[in-house]
From Swiss-Prot:
Record InterPro entries: Homeodomain-like_sf, HTH-type_Tx_Regulator, HTH_TetR, NO_SlmA, SlmA-like_C, Tet_transcr_reg_TetR-rel_C_sf
GO cellular component, one term: cytoplasm
Annotated protein name in UniProt: Nucleoid occlusion factor SlmA
UniProt gene name: slmA
Localization (cell): Cytoplasm, Nucleoid
Keyword Coiled coil on entry: yes
Domain HTH tetR-type: start-end pairs: 7-67
Length: 197
């Protein structure tokens, strides 16, 4: 029973951090500002997280769990190559759109001046997602008997660049230009080009 309020307080701190990242674009979040937002002292923050880096790691863990678990569902449930790619990219874009503050973490914007391991961890997450795309594209020849005329790693990188670019535009526009805007039309075009290759 004693652990339950602690978990809730940790979650509340992370929610406040994500909200501050959304409402204060371009500004660095200090522990003093975060403590004021949460309504506790800085010392109380440090009882739940030993450092600000650990708070960001908590957000990154949430991102990883949310995205990777859903990607695994897509991999299990959908067998069509193009639909898998579309759903994976759409998942990433919708997640960023629904979590504007967290999109700053995905973009790396919120991690400037923070511990290097945080940026490295986000980079690793994007590498994992790109690896899933490569796997999807490579399985096309096995599942459908057709291969692409260009290396699957190059195509996976292109698809990731599209998603990362949309997230960067979202952050740069201070969350006005939604990452999912025009995605369906853009995907239709990209898919046609991929199927012709």
């Amino acid at each position: 029973m004693a652990a339950s309020p602690k978990i809730n307080r940790r979650e509340h701190i992370l929610q406040c951090l994500a909200t501050m990242l959304e409402t204060s674009p371009g500004q660095r979040i200090t522990t003093a500002k975060l403590a004021a937002e949460v309504g506790v002292s800085e010392a109380a923050l440090y009882r739940h997280f030993p450092s600000k880096a650990r708070m960001f790691e908590g957000l990154i863990e949430f991102i990883e769990e949310s995205l990777l678990s859903r990607i695994n569902l897509i991999m299990d449930e959908e067998k069509d190559t193009m639909k898998r790619c579309q759903q994976l990219l759409q998942l990433l874009l919708v997640f960023a759109e629904r979590n504007p503050g967290i999109s700053r973490v995905l973009n790396g914007d919120a991690l400037l001046g923070e511990n290097e391991r945080l940026r490295s961890r986000i980079s690793q997450l994007f590498s994992k997602i790109e690896t899933h795309l490569k796997q999807i594209l490579r399985e096309k020849s096995l599942r459908e008997g057709q291969a692409f005329s260009i290396d699957e790693a190059v195509l996976a990188n292109l698809l990731m660049a599209i998603a990362e670019g949309r997230i960067a535009q979202f952050v740069r526009s201070e969350f006005k230009l939604k990452p999912t805007k025009h995605f369906n039309e853009q995907w239709t075009f990209v898919q046609q080009q991929l199927l012709q290759s």
